[in-house]
């Protein structure tokens, strides 16, 4: 097995589950946590079906050779995820260059490679339109050969604190920007509605919580089966089967959601009234659900389409779509909630969510149809599948999706359950809890970006058997986490009044938020260390160590604490926030 670096932050980021939850983003796909049995071929029985109908296409011989022969994607001794194995067969040129640059820097640091090419010129980056000399063409091969030779001969390749600080920081910076954009999708709704009033803010919070628990979390869990199946089909060069699996999963998920859509329209207010004492909040939340239901099919198609592209090694498509849709979402929230001419008030927030879901789906479709990417994503699409093919082999897909549904639901409940308890403390406490949770989610994006960058670096060192360097990376990650958490603590404590005033003009809510933010600031230190250590575990392929404790570590203690603090109403939001953290 090659000892070269093979992981980038792009493929790590692609396995992150995102939603409009007021809790912290940054959950990973269950396929990344729950190992399948070694050498199990989950697409067995469908290969012939796909091969018979696979469309023919022409391409360069070197591209065919680059894709390589199919090998098992479930090798138990390989810590790489299923998405990464498929991506191995279609490196993006920018990612490949970055990995080579990281290897080159380490070789130069250890004096195993000179800083000049064979011709003595400095290494330079060349644009696509510039001619590349023979020395530059030979340089990647020289780096790869030197790296492999050094690893195989047992020569010591070590890193330094300075080098790891630089690499982790540079890899984390674009992730911070991306994750904040993702977070802005939920932030925009909370921010716009919070100025309408405390009850409207509580209605959006309850509606979003119910939508996440009863719909979006289950949908994302169901769609995680594609992380396994599509990666195997694409790795086997059974390209047509990728499109079949994606459409089949979309059909299953949409049909599974139809009964819940009926419940949202007809029974949501009555069901919420059984748990929430404020009847007006239940009515507002039910209206939120009725509008949001129209966007759920778009959300399903987006999740399936995202995995359709990711299994082909195209990880940046959803990010490009996000760069367009996130600003549009903020604009729509302003126009539909606050604008004097077209604004509709409270219902403008869920309507913005609906429009955004469909725009994200449309964005992925436009990208797939117009992209010049060398992987040609439409080679995996052979048109709409017939009805009999859509309703075939459901059991295998559902069995693979069940662990995903269970895990994602457990993670979401760990955060969303506090919303139910906060509603028993009163409307003001519910609004304050929503604002504080939103601030916590936003503050978490910096340490979480460091965590993803760390897991990538650790995975590369583990793959190259450079265990001492892996330890240095983990120490640097902890140090960077301490620095960023200290900055978060300072900002939250120093500007707590200004932050609270941004979200609400209600004096009671502002006071609760101001009183609670010091607790949140104190917990930033532990939050950052939790993210950092989780990244170290993920890079070592030990995600299960963290996953097996999730229900008992998060859900049960928070339920118990939430019950305790919601009994004495005078305790307010501060004690509830202790359970959140």
From Swiss-Prot:
Primary location group: membrane
Cross-referenced InterPro entries: MATE_euk, MATE_fam
Biased composition (Acidic residues): 37-66
Statement: the UniProt record of this protein carries the keyword Membrane: yes
UniProt topological domain (Cytoplasmic) ranges: 194-248, 303-345, 493-581
Region of interest (Disordered), residue spans: 1-67, 117-138
Ranges in coiled-coil conformation: none
GO molecular function: antiporter activity; transmembrane transporter activity; xenobiotic transmembrane transporter activity
Membrane-spanning intervals of the chain: 173-193, 249-269, 282-302, 346-366, 472-492
GO biological process: S-adenosylmethionine biosynthetic process; xenobiotic detoxification by transmembrane export across the plasma membrane
Cell compartment(s), UniProt: Membrane
Membrane topology: Multi-pass membrane protein
Domain of life of the organism encoding this protein: Eukaryota
Membrane-side (Extracellular) residue stretches: 1-172, 270-281, 367-471
GO CC list: membrane
Swiss-Prot/TrEMBL keywords: Membrane, Transmembrane, Transmembrane helix, Transport
Purpose: Probable transporter involved in ethionine resistance. Overproduction leads to accumulation of S-adenosylmethionine.
Family per record: Belongs to the multi antimicrobial extrusion (MATE) (TC 2.A.66.1) family.
Protein name: Ethionine resistance-conferring protein 1
Organism: Saccharomyces cerevisiae (strain ATCC 204508 / S288c)
Highest classification ranks of the organism: Eukaryota, Fungi, Dikarya, Ascomycota, Saccharomycotina
